[in-house]
């Protein structure tokens, strides 16, 4: 390839949802996301861009019930957390809120917390950005 485009990370993640208010409340209470931008079409809220206080990935929620139902169950992305302690703390927080998940496991290059599902059934995974120690 003679031309290599300059890329600069992931701009945002977008999920289709069936109920904006329910999804907003869930992402706020689980992870601390807050509204950065509200997308209004013909006077109707159709989506939100959510920001995280620690600078985690921007998450966009888009009202699109048909796509939300079709996408349920798939893990589109993994959100990074700094280290094993942070992912264990997150798992404990989710458990306290009554959320089902698969627990923290050692994975190929770090620690993973899979099996968490948002109100529309999207699997939200977390992976440590700190790799496992060398063996």
PLM region spans:
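Vicinal oxygen chelate
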Residues: 1-6, 9-18, 38, 48-49, 68-135
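Conserved N-terminal glycine/acidic-rich loop preference
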Residues: 1-7, 14, 46-48, 61
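Core segments of cupin and vicinal oxygen chelate
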Residues: 16-58
């Amino acid at each position: 390839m003679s031309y290599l485009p300059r890329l600069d990370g992931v701009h945002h993640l977008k999920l289709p949802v069936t109920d904006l208010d329910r999804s907003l409340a869930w992402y706020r209470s689980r992870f601390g996301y807050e509204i950065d931008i509200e997308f209004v079409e013909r006077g109707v809220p159709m989506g939100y861009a959510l920001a995280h206080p620690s600078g985690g990935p921007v998450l966009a929620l888009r009202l699109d019930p048909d796509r939300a139902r079709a996408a349920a169950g798939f893990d589109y992305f993994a959100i990074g957390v700094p280290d094993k302690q942070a992912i264990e703390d997150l798992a404990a927080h989710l458990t306290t809120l009554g959320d089902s998940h698969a627990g923290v496991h050692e994975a190929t290059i770090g620690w993973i917390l899979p099996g968490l599902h948002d109100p529309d059934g999207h699997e939200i995974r977390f992976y440590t950005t700190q790799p496992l120690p060398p063996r």
